[in-house]
From Swiss-Prot:
Domain U-box, first and last residues per copy: 10-84
Source organism per UniProt: Arabidopsis thaliana (Mouse-ear cress)
ARM repeats: from-to residues: 178-218, 219-261, 263-304
Gene: PUB28
Pathway(s) this gene product operates in, as recorded in its UniProt entry: Protein modification; protein ubiquitination
Protein name per Swiss-Prot or TrEMBL: U-box domain-containing protein 28
GO biological process, one term: protein ubiquitination
Amino acid sequence: MRSDDLYITTVPCFFKCPISLDVMKSPVSLSTGVTYDRVSIQRWLDDGNNTCPATMQILQNKEFVPNLTLHRLIDHWSDSINRRADSESPESDTPTRDEINAAIERFRIENDARSKILRFARESDENREFLAGKDDFVAMLVDLISDSRNFSDSQLLLVGEAVKILSMIRRKIFDRRRLSNLILTNGGDCLTSFFLLIKRGNPKLKIDCSAVLEFIAVDAESKLIIAKGEGLVTEIIKLISSDSDSSLIEANLSLLIAIASSKRVKLALIREKLVTKLTSLLTDPTTSVSVTEKCLKLLEAISSCKEGRSEICDGVCVETVVNKLMKVSTAATEHAVTVLWSVCYLFKEKKAQDAVIRINGVTKILLLLQSNCSLTVRHMLTDLLKVFKVNSRSCLSVYETKTTHIMPF
């Protein structure tokens, strides 16, 4: 037995949730200063407990704050563990460029050739740049992806590996527009392949598909072509669910953000009930900070059209956005404020205004004005307060003693 077979990963104790004893995926801190995994502490509080599990102190409030510093440390540690595992793999010997040139010639017919190219691409930025600079190789990958006429299991594997390599080298491809044209001007065959891979592939392959599609969404025309791909958007939105892997959700949200620029695309997303999906994610306590930011950014884009605002103002979406105004991240705050500014101030949607007042959203707006927010956000918050002063002056009266100094009017 090799010595590295006996290697056991030691998890730092402060990376473990005191409740589950597992590595925390979304660390949050209570008012006592103790950090827990969001899922575990939310379950503890939902069960009616009002104490900190570790210290047994009675909680003055049940709010928790994302521990972003610890989250980054855990991510860094996890990445280092994965890199060490890869470096200890018996397959870690990197092929030479001459071997790669020979492997490219045999790519279609030999599994070993494809594995060799994948190992080469994983090794370094220089290797990925080398592959991306070979126009004939990139064109061959696109040609393989477009062959969706006979999608057998073996063909699915071949096309999937082509997508995986293309995803790995995409950021080293200098001419994005040329790649976009290669993929999108072949009668739709490539988009059909992407649809089948997203429908039938494993989560990692689905992420690679979304990453490539996001990369080639370079202008209004390409974004519309992707959005109109048969069944593609429908399948992507299906995967935006709390049941899905967080990385997969994030990749799909990034793709939707990339294509949601024109009104036609926004209407297509609205018809697929995207707002309902986003609201569901935002109300889920296990949703990560980055996914929350992307959900709010999509709502911001959708709020620019009438149909989008109608969806946002129905149900609990507005209340959910108000709840994300604080204690998530600066980006989340900016997107949430913009959504509220759009529906409440710019387009004066009565339902949205009523919802903000109903859940005491004006308090959070006032508190945000006292925070270190950007000048743009401050202007939008001031506009919002003007709306609520006109529409419901009584809702501000209780704050006049402590917050008069920040009132913008």
